[in-house]
């Protein structure tokens, strides 16, 4: 980028000097020049556009040679316990290492190779290669976001961020949970790690609440690389809809509600387009 800017500056300076000597430009205020004729302006623009095109082509070619991480399963990991993680992206079958966080921790590469692309999805969006990793985060690792960087012989990817939680903050979804009678009981403050496994599938969770409680129920999916477009609905104990929501933050869903009465409530999570599969993963959290 610096070299490109320097070349462009030198070119423009040279054209200005030539134009000034030939009388094709008139000196304006504050050292600016205005052309007498449009010929040199056209020539200047043509050269500048050529330089810009060459620079962009070179940058694109370089970007095509370095790896890129587009998603991870699971979407969140815990500290202090062994982690198995699958990354998807471009050129991950060529990685030599995965850097974890800003320290010296590196993941063990268990396997790497090509990955099947789901029908009707762009390979650049979902990734056509994958890598399976193993590592353990120190227990003192703070909650929040953690960067992962894929490295090949050609260079390193831009950092990909994954959500980190303290031990026991994550709850794994348990099947079957596709109806009120089989709803999975969850607690406030915990994060459920779930998957919409098949088309036209609904995951149902039961929550105990008190009258007057103000709750925030959120689903995180697309903003952390999932293919899922979540639709979130809250039902009361009688199975009546309290509130439903599709998109809030991008294509993810959040709803805020004050409970009218005490008792059981049911939260349903599904894809807004009735899609499903191993890449339709999500995080569900209820806070007050």
Regions found by a protein language model. Give the residues of each.
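Internal, charge-rich low-complexity segments
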Residues: 7-8, 15, 108-120
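Acidic, Ser/Thr/Pro-rich low-complexity intrinsically disordered segments
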Residues: 64-116, 130, 153, 168, ...
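Strand-loop-strand motifs at the edges of beta-sheets in extracellular beta-sandwich domains
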Residues: 114-118, 122-136
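Long, low-complexity ectodomains and other extracytoplasmic segments of secretory-pathway proteins
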Residues: 162-172
């Amino acid at each position: 980028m610096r070299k490109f800017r320097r070349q462009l500056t030198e070119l423009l300076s040279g054209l200005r000097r030539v134009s000034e000597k030939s009388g094709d430009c008139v000196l304006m205020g504050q050292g600016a020049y205005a052309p007498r004729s449009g010929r040199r302006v056209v020539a200047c623009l043509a050269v500048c556009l050529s330089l810009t095109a060459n620079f962009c082509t070179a940058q694109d070619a370089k970007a095509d040679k370095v790896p890129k991480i587009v998603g991870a399963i699971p979407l969140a990991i815990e500290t202090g316990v062994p982690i198995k993680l699958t990354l998807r992206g471009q050129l991950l079958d060529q990685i030599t290492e995965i850097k974890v966080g800003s320290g010296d921790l590196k993941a063990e590469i268990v396997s790497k190779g090509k990955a099947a692309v789901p029908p009707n999805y762009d390979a650049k969006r979902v990734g056509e290669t994958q890598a399976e990793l193993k590592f353990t985060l120190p227990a003192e690792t703070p909650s929040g976001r953690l960067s992962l960087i894929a490295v090949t012989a050609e260079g390193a990817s831009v950092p990909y961020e994954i959500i980190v939680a303290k031990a026991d903050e994550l709850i794994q979804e348990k099947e079957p949970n596709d109806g009120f009678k089989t709803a999975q009981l969850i607690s406030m403050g915990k994060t459920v790690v779930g998957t919409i496994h098949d088309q036209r599938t609904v995951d149902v969770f039961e929550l105990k609440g008190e009258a007057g409680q103000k709750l925030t129920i959120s689903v995180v999916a697309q903003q952390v690389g999932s293919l899922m477009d979540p639709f979130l609905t809250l039902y009361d104990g009688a199975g009546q809809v309290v509130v439903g929501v599709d998109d809030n933050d991008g294509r993810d869903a959040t709803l805020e509600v004050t409970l009218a009465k005490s008792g059981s409530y049911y939260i349903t999570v599904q894809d807004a387009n009735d899609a499903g599969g191993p890449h339709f993963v999500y995080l569900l959290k209820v806070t007050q």
